A protein has these predicted regions:
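Entry beta-strands of beta-propeller and related beta-repeat scaffolds
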Residues: 36-38
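Short hydrophobic alpha-helical segments used for membrane anchoring or interfacial signaling
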Residues: 30-32
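Unchanged
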Residues: 54-77, 84-137
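Acidic, metal-coordinating catalytic segment for phosphate/diphosphate chemistry
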Residues: 1-28
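Residue-level detector of functional hotspots within protein domains
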Residues: 13-17, 23, 40, 84, ...
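Nudix hydrolase/Nudix homology domain
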Residues: 47, 113-189
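C-terminal lobe/hinge of AMP-binding adenylation domains
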Residues: 41-45
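A short gly/proline-enriched turn/hairpin at secondary-structure junctions
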Residues: 48-52
Length: 189
């Protein structure tokens, strides 16, 4: 191996193995139904918050309207209640948790989920929390608390942060520049 090849290999071994690719950005919807229930997607027994990916330069709020469609008058989004991200080997996976206005059971009956294999169900909040995987459970608990307090919560790698991290960039808010990539599955759960 030549000296140049060895030098390049040594640099690659020391370089951080992260953010080689643009982040995957997704949305999860927190849909309150009445005072004690949530609407969830049920994919053959696996419960999850309704979610989907955001396309290049698409705002999370716009992506949310592709996740659930069909309610009379459209889906009324209140605000972003949480931003959850994890650093994988090559990119960040960022999920925006958006809360909708409270819905009635009748209105939820008109919702159509983007994945035809899943059905939208209304379940008691406690049952939803028990039935979700760990990451989804954290998003629901923190999202509900943030909705109640009027704050936005920040979750990094499964840890709730006390405040917004100083390095938030526009790409985190769905305003990515350059670099392609299709929508990801960041929002599942």
């Amino acid at each position: 191996m030549s000296a140049v090849t060895q030098a390049v290999a040594a640099l690659r071994m020391r370089a951080p193995y992260e953010n080689w690719r643009p982040p995957v950005i997704g949305v999860s919807l927190l849909v309150p139904v009445g005072a004690d229930c949530l609407a969830v997607a049920d994919l053959r027994g696996m419960l999850m918050l309704p979610g989907g990916g955001a396309y290049e330069r698409q705002r999370p709020e716009d992506a949310a309207h592709r996740v659930l469609s069909g309610p009379p008058g459209g889906l009324r989004l209140l605000r972003r209640v949480a931003v959850d991200w994890v650093q994988t080997r090559r990119r960040k996976v960022i999920t925006h948790v958006l809360a909708t206005a409270p819905m009635t059971r009748e209105a939820v009956g008109h919702l159509i989920y983007r994945d035809p294999r899943a059905t939208v169900r209304v379940l008691p909040t406690v049952r939803v929390i028990d039935g979700l995987p760990t990451q989804g459970r954290l998003r629901v608990l923190v999202g509900l608390q943030a909705l109640a307090t009027g704050e936005t919560a920040y979750i990094e790698g499964g840890v709730v942060l006390p405040s917004a991290p100083p390095n938030l960039t526009q790409e985190w808010w769905g305003q990515r520049r350059g670099g392609g990539g299709r929508a990801g599955w960041a929002a599942a759960g």
